[in-house]
Amino acid sequence: MDIRQEALKKHYEWKGKLEIAPRTHVTNSEELSLAYTPGVAEPCLAIRDDYEKSYLLTRRANMVAVITDGSAILGLGDIGPEAGMPVMEGKCVLFKEFAGVDAFPLCVRTKDVDELVRTIYLISGSFGGNNLEDIAATRCFEVERKLKEICDIPVFHDDQHGTAVVVAAALLNALKVVGKTMETAKVVINGAGSAGVAIGKHLMNLGVKDLIMVDRFGIICEGMEGLNPAHEEMSRKTNPRHITGTLADAMRGADVFIGVSAPGVVTREMVASMNEGACVFPMANPVPEIHPDEALAAGAAVVGSGRSDYKNQINNVLAFPGIFRGALDCRAKDINEAMKVAASYAIANLVADDELSADYIIPKAFDKRVGPAVAEAVAKAARETGVARI
């Protein structure tokens, strides 16, 4: 089966993957007067008097906006907001299927940061959270930062933080398999876009000390010319040994390789140059930085990728549904670092020590334990850090 052609055929059949379904029915005059006028005036007045009651008297408490400007849709690039709608609809389906969260796609016709921020802020009263999706770097960093400053509901860019949470969960267990720790591992991240930067920050929050980031111009180091603000920040926080050069130079003697970059950029020789017990996560999709079988043949001890046809699939669906479920359940004002760290540990801990192996470092995408475990851990962290309302 050609999955691409079959998917196109199905989308023509479905005519969209979402629909609006009522939670109550209006079949007679009494039901009409309760659901709409005149009875609906009472919940309106209650919310006017107490804004927080919007969470109790409407569906807002379970609603997330899934928002894109169409500028970085999958690996397709800037294809426009309308062309991004199938992805946003798909994301909304995953929210519902994996965590019972009602999500609504919003594809916005602007590339202007302030206009996008203003638009999202103005509609935030209808939702319990904002999930940013497929917004190009470096604009995505600025959009998220500005929204977090003004919104009183969680703002979460899944391409950054969902990826980081799941990568970290996989790495926590991979390092257990090879007898290493976050604190001592030498980590290389190839790809310094939204995902790469977020992974780097998250791993440092989990204890990584020796981290090197590489982009298409080579190893990122302090004082390097032409760095954007995100790369400038990372240049000050990473590369403690002040290494310069290429990806091959970075990988020599490394314990961990994480790829969020481009197909085929890693060779067998690069993997072979890593330390014994190397963990290799080539996650470019659909074609990874190096084929998992090649990485294993070159000496990698543990390999994970973004592909479902290999063991250890590192998939965001393990993170974002449960993270938002937990945030909504405690009515969080933010999704902070402690909540993301809690999510990583919750995912990792679902793999019992007696099950853990090089072939099984992370739960399967359809493991029904994942969403509830992540939600519980995230809500607990939210309450402990003071961002929960209930």
Residue ranges and their predicted role:
Residues D158-D159, V178-T181, P282-I390:
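Adenosine-phosphate binding glycine-rich loop
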